[in-house]
A protein has these predicted regions:
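Nucleotidyltransferase catalytic core that binds NTPs
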Residues: 1-81
Length: 81
């Protein structure tokens, strides 16, 4: 079965082979895959710009992948309680 749209999200802090494998598998099952990169300027270990470039460069040969940025403004997990 081929889906019209798929979504795979994460902080990718850092991007690793498990993420890459799952994104490739998801993209092969979708006409369009949105990879949602969540980031927080307060908590991230690796700057969002680096992680964005890693994802972009890792999948630039796959035309059906689009990267979306999603900022998380909470300072820590207790802000969600």
């Amino acid at each position: 079965m081929r889906y019209k749209v798929g979504m795979y999200g994460g902080a990718f802090d850092p991007l690793h082979i498990g993420h890459i494998d799952l994104i490739i598998k998801a993209a092969s099952q979708c006409e369009k895959l949105y990879v949602v990169l969540s980031y927080s300027r307060n908590r991230d270990n690796i700057p969002m710009e680096y992680r964005y470039r890693w994802i972009r460069n890792s999948f630039k040969h796959m035309d059906n992948i689009e990267i979306i940025l999603l900022e998380d403004n909470a300072y820590n997990k207790s802000d969600y309680d």
